[in-house]
Amino acid sequence: MARQPHILHLNWSASNAELLRNGARNDCTAVGNQNSNDLFRFTRGRFLSDESRHLSKRYVQFEIDELARLAVRAAETASQGSRRCVNTEKLPDGMHNKVVRFTMDDGSQIVGKVPNPNAGKANFTTASEVATMDFLRNVMKIPIPNVLAWSSTSENELWDKLEVNVKFKVLRNIAFYQEAWLHTTFSHYGSLYYKNDVGLSTPSVEYTDKAGVTIVDDRFTIGPSVSRQNTDDGRLEMDFDRGPWTTAADYERATGLREIYCTENMPKLPRSPIALHYSGTYQPSRESKILAIESYLKLLRYLLPEVSIQTSHIWHCDLHAENIFVNPSNLSEIYGIIDWQSTELAPLYDHPIEPYILEYDGPPLDGLLDRPKLADIRSLFQGDPEPLAERKATSLYTKMSLVSLYRHLVHKKMPLLFKALEFRETLCFQLLLFTRNLLVDGEATYLALLADQQQNNWKDIPKLNHTDEKFPLVFSAEMLRQIERDHIGATSSMELMREIQEMIGPKYFYARGVVTHDEYNEVSQIIPRAKKEFIRKYARDEGEIAELESAWPFD
């Protein structure tokens, strides 16, 4: 969460460059303050695993002078004084974008965002984000500002410093915007675009507002999904159905077909980030992944929730502190919500309903509407000395109380959204959710869940448990034994990865395998020792030494 600065948000795309080549004034003097190659590469930190691949996916060259000229034009629109760019500065990288700040001669600032190759298909990513922001700001009246700031570490700590009553007011304001998203439903599932970006022959967007009125807006259309699940882990280069779709069932079926297509056609399966696989544990195969995905497709119609929460909605799926701007004079007032890249029109139940700003490392509440008990939480820290134990208990109690308050607010104000929240707690939703990443990992666990359901008469899948129909999926006795063996091996693989991370140090794995440059200098001394110790512990012969050398996940 950050206090809002007075700067503009500028997206860079190929169409911007074309506009500049065809007549924009060359009246910007950009003063670079760093190595030009640093503008193009990822400099925020280092990757612990497969660094060269991660860096290549985040390297993008662009014309900084062209972007600066466009920044001047944007500044002129917002201010009568800006005529010249006097400084450029690259801000800390996002995981999917480069961000450059341009300072004008009148002190105003423009922030330009350039998508990395891993952000999505070049001809769709920016087009969809801009159209989405336009629709949200001008049709739904959501505060999508003409501003973008990169929040530094100190600014990101603002949420933690707020009083509890202020935090709840922020959550109440977030719920207000969620209510607007809830009451706007779309005819299709996919992503928003301007019609002239994807072809004027495409149908105009059709949506239903809070009053139940169906509206057709000729400026927009619904096209292919730009969701991260369609681009990550090599999927970006694959040719599969990205939508749009007309039903939630079609949307979910496309997920399974995508995972099968990628599993069958990728030259090499992606390496799991959560498990270490070798012959001593479990080794993934295309066959086991396809079995899991085909099983999902057979069960799909039994997994879907009731129709009322299958409707298509726009949603912000990453409401963490960096994406919420507040009024410096009134910290509970939300000025704007940013980062709508990869926004998808998806089924209501599919969207993350509880804002990520509520996430915490602690025990789950027993039920969605249960309230935490301070005495129970204090018991978790009995082994810690005072006053540390009391501080930990109070902090955890506060975080759990905010989750409880938010859930009660949703239950009271938005019962349909609460129904979606309830569905997200079920096995049916977990089976829908886990399918989205079976290309990468999880097939052994997925099949074990299905095997357990078969052996227990599908007790957690109500549509199967209460039907006289023939079960669509039946594993043989031999297959059940193989699934159990694979599950045990896969569990061991995950335990080995956790052990490796403990040996190296948990503090280096808090941010998706990205560390600061100083941390990298530290951990690069630790990793070789941990690797040597790990292989000595688990390798039983020369063959396994070679295997574990090859399987070792960290550079």
Feature roles, as predicted:
Residues 2-156, 163, 176-179, 187, ...:
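Conserved NTP-binding catalytic cores of kinases and kinase-like/nucleotidyltransferase enzymes
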Residues 320, 332, 341, 441, ...:
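C-terminal subdomain of alpha/beta-hydrolase-fold enzymes, centered on the catalytic histidine
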Residues 350-412, 426-445, 455-457:
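Active-site activation/catalytic loop segments of kinase-like enzymes and analogous catalytic loops
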Residues 86-294, 302-314, 332-333:
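ATP-binding pocket architecture of kinase catalytic cores
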Residues 98-101, 112, 295-350, 543, ...:
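Active-site acidic catalytic loop and adjacent metal/ATP-binding pocket
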Residues 12-16, 24-32, 44, 163, ...:
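Residues that cap or delimit alpha-helices
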Residues 194, 202-219, 313-315, 320-383:
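Catalytic activation segment of kinase domains across protein kinase-like and atypical kinase folds
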Residues 214-306, 387-420, 424-431, 453-554:
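Long, low-complexity, polar/charged, intrinsically disordered or flexibly structured peripheral segments
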